[in-house]
Amino acid sequence: MKKVLLIDRDGTLILETDDFKIEKYEKLVFYPGVFQWLGRIARELNYDLAMVTNQDGLGTELFPEDEFNAVQDFIVRTFAGESINFVGVHIDKSYPHENLPTRKPGTGMLTQYMQGHYDLANSFVIGDRITDVKLAKNLGSKCIFMNDGRNLGAGETGADNATTLQPYIAIETRDWEQIYNFLKSLEGSID
């Protein structure tokens, strides 16, 4: 059965900005090492890759969708140019207070991975927010937590926090090389 890496965008593939919106090219900076090490994961290891991101209020006057889409398309094309291809790109546009099932940590936009074609127990969510860890819990997976200590997303996980979610964290790192080495070490040790 296939395995998948469900990878957050902002703070994981690209650097997070102070206003948590990347709708302009000037704000776009790719995460250090992401092309080299995610590229090796894509070429050498047996994982499908999917991008999963919450984009609060996308499509509103404050966060125009056409500007976002131009940058988003550039991001996806840049990864593809490095032979890093995503089987899916999943973008939730809602605000946290809307509590929609499609918003991480909800699994509503990821049902295609939950229909028995993917081995979620041996798959990973990779992200920098507590919501990414809780998403892993909700999927029956583990999280590779790119923890920067800011506790981002903690207000969206109910009673769960970094301590209560610790059993769902496979490793904590801020380094794509460590992620590659961790996943490589699992080769042959997972059914």
Say what each PLM segment does.
Residues V34, L38-V71, F86-E98, A136:
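Substrate-recognition element of Asp-dependent hydrolases with the DxDx(T/V) motif
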Residues L15-T17, K93, N147:
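Residue-level signal for short segments within beta-strands and strand-turn junctions
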Residues D66, D73-N85, E98-V125, R129-D191:
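Asp-based, Mg2+/Mn2+-dependent phosphohydrolase catalytic module
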Residues D19-K27, G59-T60, P96-N99:
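Surface-exposed cleft-lining segments at the edges of enzyme active sites
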Residues Y25-F30, F63-A70, K104-P105:
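Alpha-helix N-cap and loop-to-helix initiation/capping positions
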Residues M1-L49:
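Active-site neighborhood of HAD-like aspartate-dependent phosphohydrolases
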Residues I7-R9, T53, G127-D128:
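Active-site flanking residues adjacent to catalytic metal/cofactor-binding acidic residues
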